[in-house]
């Protein structure tokens, strides 16, 4: 059987979510790089995979899927039984299943809207404006942190009663928190979690999982302007870039290219080339397309 294909880049939170559940179930997969800042996700080839021109694209044989949380559920339903995992709670009682559904919705509707603006302001804006010329919008950060504290207070109360959000076993709901929280914990506001000891302990349990470590190992925490190399680092090793990505085979006008530093190998897996003002406008319009 051919491995499933994930189209995107492992630094993106939605791509990382899909990779995380593939790693949890031990499924074989191929990661196909997509240069999103160069606009490859808007080209016809990718739009055939994802009509909304977002990432990831996901292909399993002739079957195409979109939306990272839906893809993750597909992965668990197809491969979770073989791996002995019931992260969706579908083999448990109706109450357990309901709790997984509830906290999955809480993550998407309450937690994500509170935490993502902080990540965007502290990581994305400085990343796409060369030289660090764009300071975070402190009003947005402060308002988001206030909202996040309200959510974390509810989480703290919940985790005083159970080991994980949906009960005493880890679930789909818990693991969906990984991508954005990972980046949040690299910001100056990570200490907010120290105010909620049960939440902090829960987060540390999640980060201790081998699958989580394999995926987060390739989610960069350092962004620098460097020369380009020819590999894409993934949880399954380095994937050579396509010939078209080889600067020796492609003539381009001089431009500043921002790259991400793979923390595990110190190699440079990707380059982004776009005028900073255009990139900033695009990011503000659709921040989820960047992380």
From Swiss-Prot:
Binding site for glutathione: 41-42, 54-55, 67-68
Note, other: GSTA2 is said to be a defective gene.
GO biological process, alphabetically ordered: glutathione metabolic process; response to toxic substance
Enzyme Commission number(s): 2.5.1.18
Entry similarity comment: Belongs to the GST superfamily. Phi family.
Catalysed conversion reaction: RX + glutathione = an S-substituted glutathione + a halide anion + H(+)
Gene: GSTA2
Species this protein is from: Triticum aestivum (Wheat)
GST C-terminal domain ranges (all copies): 93-223
Functional description taken from the UniProt entry: Conjugation of reduced glutathione to a wide number of exogenous and endogenous hydrophobic electrophiles.
Full protein name: Glutathione S-transferase 2
Pfam families documented for this protein: GST_C, GST_N
Keywords: Transferase
GST N-terminal domain sequence ranges: 2-83
GO CC annotations, alphabetized: cytoplasm
Any one GO molecular function term: glutathione transferase activity
PANTHER family recorded: GLUTATHIONE S-TRANSFERASE 1, GLUTATHIONE S-TRANSFERASE RHO
